Amino acid sequence: MSARGPAIGIDLGTTYSCVGVFQHGKVEIIANDQGNRTTPSYVAFTDTERLIGDAAKNQVAMNPTNTIFDAKRLIGRKFEDATVQSDMKHWPFRVVSEGGKPKVQVEYKGEMKTFFPEEISSMVLTKMKEIAEAYLGGKVQSAVITVPAYFNDSQRQATKDAGTITGLNVLRIINEPTAAAIAYGLDKKGCAGGEKNVLIFDLGGGTFDVSILTIEDGIFEVKSTAGDTHLGGEDFDNRMVSHLAEEFKRKHKKDIGPNKRAVRRLRTACERAKRTLSSSTQASIEIDSLYEGVDFYTSITRARFEELNADLFRGTLEPVEKALRDAKLDKGQIQEIVLVGGSTRIPKIQKLLQDFFNGKELNKSINPDEAVAYGAAVQAAILIGDKSENVQDLLLLDVTPLSLGIETAGGVMTPLIKRNTTIPTKQTQTFTTYSDNQSSVLVQVYEGERAMTKDNNLLGKFDLTGIPPAPRGVPQIEVTFDIDANGILNVTAADKSTGKENKITITNDKGRLSKDDIDRMVQEAERYKSEDEANRDRVAAKNAVESYTYNIKQTVEDEKLRGKISEQDKNKILDKCQEVINWLDRNQMAEKDEYEHKQKELERVCNPIISKLYQGGPGGGGSSGGPTIEEVD
């Protein structure tokens, strides 16, 4: 289903996102307008505009309550979710509940607004799409978007919805470690040797995944996956922030906790110090006037940073052990350990991992920040039918991260699809009634590994009615679970005797956005986009009239023009320029056409005088009399 134009791969990260495109037989990771190959997953709302990416992150200290980040830690979760509740303690912005779903609350253009996490993520995706469009010089319609391997069904659905709101045709949702494995596998293409067991250790800003794959002749088969959808670089920052806030309190008897701006400035300094500590053993922190005029100058050693995070760092090995157990592999059977995600640059994490694998060298051949987007771009090319030899013989076999099943008598979880089953997949099992003359059955679908459904996660439920009266155990009800390549589930139940069936696509019951919601958000996204564009045009018009005014002013004040222009004409221009400058000071928020009108007004006064000046100027060359002024459109 090749859409028009190339398809892109987007790594939608917790803290940073990255976009790539596969063309001319290779992947390009695309830099944004600031020249950065990763873009902060930040959206800020101000009195006048909406900012996304670097611009949003750069102003966060001035505007902490209206700058949203970490949408990925909210997406597809319930407001009551314990992790959401604990995260809210760290966030400077407000999270409120609407129908059990979390929404962020901000003040935008003087009004209170609330947004679902899908909407915030769609704004980040829009930015990534625009970055790609600027580079490719055309519209982009299709994309592959990545998610942590351990994301559950509702988190995947919500991510797909975010893509839809952006106006993208989401070709597929793929797992981040799988995408990284493609990047690694392509990188290693042509190396000798048959099947390889590869462990991908992916520790990013907010999530942690471990996946074990076998790669053989372009076939990538995921054997197992484990992880923590809630562990990453930000958690390491949090530990340092708490530690230094305590130190500040001890030294200066002041608690910065309630002051969001101070906490934010400290966090930014901590993030920078953490990066420094990956290459140096000590980092200094210098923040002028952190709180109530008190400067905060201190330093932190690598050893101290490691001690603050010792339990978190050590904890990264548990999912590694679990993934090995699930793949039925011994650690000696892993041929390659591939590091992905910025947090894998931390020396202590590398050392723990290397020691766990008895000193085996870690593979650092792929850029940890870009590998996921790289793999997603390759997968996008495959899905729209790219025929270049590098990708045509790649096959990606992914797995479902959690077991899926239904509740049977006594609240027992009966799995139909075991975790780590390769997808797409379809499984059917026959069930029967529990009591005599039972005319309907309730099919309740769960995901999880526990024996009782109450400990697992309810995905959805439906009734199959109209079962003819019969003794218990006689009716035969066939339940089919069908998972597509995106990991999205359809469940069907059919009564064999009557052929009656009912089915559910696991979506809405898990707090997924309805079609109407998505359509509304698509329109709103368009509206915000056009507002952003209108604002850009407005600012451009303002800058144009401003630079025109100052240029004219400089031209007539130029010493070289003395004697070529009458004092009367000169004063006429200068008075008009001053009038426009005063008007600009008072009207910073005027409309585009008002600025254009002001510029034309000024031109009407200046043009006759300036043209007279250049015609009448000596030598008739005209251009020697100072800068010529072009109208800025």
Curated annotation (Swiss-Prot):
Coiled-coil annotated spans: none
> What exactly does this protein do?
Molecular chaperone implicated in a wide variety of cellular processes, including protection of the proteome from stress, folding and transport of newly synthesized polypeptides, activation of proteolysis of misfolded proteins and the formation and dissociation of protein complexes. Plays a pivotal role in the protein quality control system, ensuring the correct folding of proteins, the re-folding of misfolded proteins and controlling the targeting of proteins for subsequent degradation. This is achieved through cycles of ATP binding, ATP hydrolysis and ADP release, mediated by co-chaperones.
Q: Which residues carry this modification: N6,N6,N6-trimethyllysine?
A: K564
- Tell me which NCBIfam families the record gives: PRK00290.1
Domain remarks in the Swiss-Prot or TrEMBL record: The N-terminal nucleotide binding domain (NBD) (also known as the ATPase domain) is responsible for binding and hydrolyzing ATP. The C-terminal substrate-binding domain (SBD) (also known as peptide-binding domain) binds to the client/substrate proteins. The two domains are allosterically coupled so that, when ATP is bound to the NBD, the SBD binds relatively weakly to clients. When ADP is bound in the NBD, a conformational change enhances the affinity of the SBD for client proteins.
Q: Where is this region: Disordered?
A: 613-633
Per UniProt, the ranges with Gly residues bias are: 616-625
Enumerate the subcellular locations listed in this protein's record, separating them with semicolons: Cytoplasm, Cytoskeleton, Spindle
Q: Where is this region: Substrate-binding domain (SBD)?
A: 397-512
Q: What is this protein called?
A: Heat shock-related 70 kDa protein 2
PANTHER family referenced in this protein's UniProt entry, alphabetically: HEAT SHOCK PROTEIN 70KDA
Tissues in which the protein is found = Expressed in male germ cells (at protein level).
Q: Which residues carry this modification: Phosphothreonine?
A: T408, T414
Family, per entry: Belongs to the heat shock protein 70 family.
Q: Where is this region: Nucleotide-binding domain (NBD)?
A: 2-389
Q: Which CDD domains match?
A: ASKHA_NBD_HSP70_HSPA1 (cd10233)
Q: Which GO terms describe its molecular function?
A: ATP binding; ATP-dependent protein folding chaperone; disordered domain specific binding; enzyme binding; glycolipid binding; protein-folding chaperone binding; tau protein binding; unfolded protein binding
Q: How does it assemble?
A: Interacts with FKBP6. Interacts with ZNF541. Component of the CatSper complex. Interacts with RABL2/RABL2A; binds preferentially to GTP-bound RABL2. Interacts with SHCBP1L; this interaction may promote the recruitment of HSPA2 to the spindle. Interacts with MOV10L1.
Q: Which residues carry this modification: Phosphoserine?
A: S403
Q: Which organism is it from?
A: Mus musculus (Mouse)
Q: Where does ATP bind?
A: 13-16, 72, 205-207, 271-278, 342-345
Source superkingdom? Eukaryota
> Which UniProt keywords are given for this protein, alphabetically ordered?
ATP-binding, Chaperone, Cytoplasm, Cytoskeleton, Differentiation, Methylation, Nucleotide-binding, Phosphoprotein, Spermatogenesis, Stress response
A GO-annotated cellular component: cell surface
Q: Name one GO biological process term.
A: positive regulation of ATPase-coupled calcium transmembrane transporter activity
Q: Name one Pfam family in it.
A: HSP70
